[in-house]
Design a protein with these regions (language model features):
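Gly/Ser-rich catalytic/binding loops embedded in alpha/beta enzyme cores
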Residues: 1-101
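Fold-level recognition of mixed alpha/beta catalytic cores in primary-metabolism enzymes, strongest
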Residues: 84-149
Length: 149
């Protein structure tokens, strides 16, 4: 499976689309990543995000622009737009995104895939935060995107 770029994956850069964080290679994985890998999941890629996960599209100066695979002139949405685009293009079957203000739901809608914003706290956000940030967002949730419900 793939995972949104903003999740910590040991040995992989986690930039949140910010060029200042381009060299931020984490040495430990997010709790959700650890649980997925313990269950046998193989992560084979991270998907694009807008700068600081704060836009309705998925462009950043680190990785460029994610495009909607149904029409490359259109956005796949944001902030989990890279996730939804990868699913719609058939590059992956499942992706882990995050959502505060429709960051899973809008990209899923734009790309014709399924996205779920679960109840807050169902999945731990540990490891899905900017470097050196101790507190977690009190409204951010971790959730899945898939090709279908």
């Amino acid at each position: 499976m793939t995972i949104k770029e903003s999740y910590n994956v040991a040995g992989s850069p986690t930039t949140w689309g910010d060029p200042v964080l381009k060299a931020n290679v984490t040495d430990c994985s997010a709790l959700s990543v650890e649980r997925l890998e313990k269950a046998g999941v193989v992560l084979f890629g991270k998907t694009n995000v807008p700068l600081m996960l704060a836009d309705y599209q998925s462009y950043n100066a680190v990785y460029g622009t994610a495009r909607n695979p149904w029409n490359i002139d259109l956005t796949p949405g944001g902030s989990s737009g890279g996730s939804a685009a990868a699913l719609a293009a058939g590059m992956t079957g499942i992706d882990a995104g995050s959502d505060i203000g429709s960051s899973i739901r809008n990209p899923a809608h734009y790309c014709g895939v399924f996205g779920l914003k679960p109840t807050w706290g169902v999945i731990s956000p540990k490891g899905h935060a900017l470097p050196n940030v101790v507190a977690y967002g009190d409204i951010s949730v971790i959730g899945p995107l898939t090709r279908g419900a």
